[in-house]
From Swiss-Prot:
This is ATP synthase subunit delta. It is found in: Cell membrane. NCBIfam families: ATP_synt_delta, PRK05758.2-1. GO terms for cellular component: plasma membrane; proton-transporting ATP synthase complex. Keywords: ATP synthesis, Cell membrane, CF(1), Hydrogen ion transport, Ion transport, Membrane, Transport. GO terms for molecular function: proton-transporting ATP synthase activity, rotational mechanism. The lineage of its organism: Bacteria, Bacillati, Bacillota, Bacilli, Lactobacillales. Belongs to the ATPase delta chain family. PANTHER family: ATP SYNTHASE DELTA CHAIN.
Amino acid sequence: MDKKTQALVGQYARSLVEVAFEQDAVSTIQEEVRQILTVFAETNLKTFLSQVNVTSEAKKESLSFFQESCSVYMNNFLEVISLNDRANILYDVLKLVLELFDQEDNTYDVTVTSASPLSEEQKTRLLTIVSQKFEIKTRRLVEKIDEELIGGFVIKAKNKFVDTSIRSQLQAFKMNLK
């Protein structure tokens, strides 16, 4: 994404976040953004809206489906996106909106990659420790399995990264031997 588009995405995202806080509709807009992003993930809507050969009218019609079930604030936002012919950046705008909300209330998803599945007790303890060490509120734990780690785990949250995997320790040991 070029700098001009990135600036545009930021401008639209900040505008929606501002409205959410001004109108005390943060939780409503967060939920609506998540629902729309789910539709993006489950369909080819992002590709469709990015196509230059798809008419503005067709894109507007696609966005109108969301307007039927969204708040007045989201409806207005989607209307502005349509009127300004910016449907092609909607996905990026919505992703940034969630990031801005996260930054505002210091709440983040925690991604844990481990060699084998974690027990519920381990997940709970891990969320508590991450919350304290990273000084964040944790929303949920996203668990990934990567058997190549051999043992240990990798944690990612709020642009922070902790790697205690045996694989990384072996790689570090190998580098020290050279």
